[in-house]
Amino acid sequence: MKDAIKRRPGIKIGAFCAMALILTGCMGQDPVDSLHHSLEKAAESEKPFQEEQNTLKELEAKENQLYDSVMKLNMDDYKKIVALSNKALENVSKREEHLKLENDSMKKSETEFEEAKTSAEHIKEKDIKEKADAAANHMEKRYTSYGTMYKEYKKALELNKKLYMQLKDKDLTRDDLDQQIDKVNASYEKILKYSGEFNEQTEKYNKAREDLYDAAGYRVKKS
């Protein structure tokens, strides 16, 4: 393999390292209190999301190590190449499982947030209503960014699968391998872009929510 490839996939460990929502306590029953309660439930629903991100980062690091090990070998070590590629394929499968769990967490959060939007519609205080709408706008953009990022990550995992299947092929050409690596690189570059957008909207949402809570008289716990 040393003669077959000079580059490696541009896998960025922590590409999914997004920022967590800020949690506070919850209260009451009027529209503002109901909004507050629903927002906190949405944040609580994302705890598994944060846990899965950590697991995915660990798996990404292990996959990088496997890739590096394969690239140090040549075709005289074909059996080792196959064994390492199989381990990498198992790693990709695990990442698919954890990515699904992460996505499930975000879907639950989004469901809770829809309830928050309903509560916001009944707020009569103009200043609080404007701040609630601003927070909702950033949160909706955040969910959209995550959805795009999730789809691209799934695509990247499929491309990784194909890469490791190719590495087990004795007849693999340099051109075919380079083309697949380019596809993996391009996919991970998109993930980084979407991750940045997601993190930006998370920061804006957290700030908008702080403003909302300040206006409504809630204490915001920073973490």
Curated annotation (Swiss-Prot):
Main localization, broad class: membrane
This protein's record includes keyword Cell membrane: yes
Lipidation (S-diacylglycerol cysteine): 26
One Pfam family it belongs to: YkyA
InterPro entries on file: Lipoprot_YkyA-like, YkyA-like_sf
Membrane topology, record value: Lipid-anchor
Name of the protein in question: Uncharacterized lipoprotein YkyA
Organism: Bacillus subtilis (strain 168)
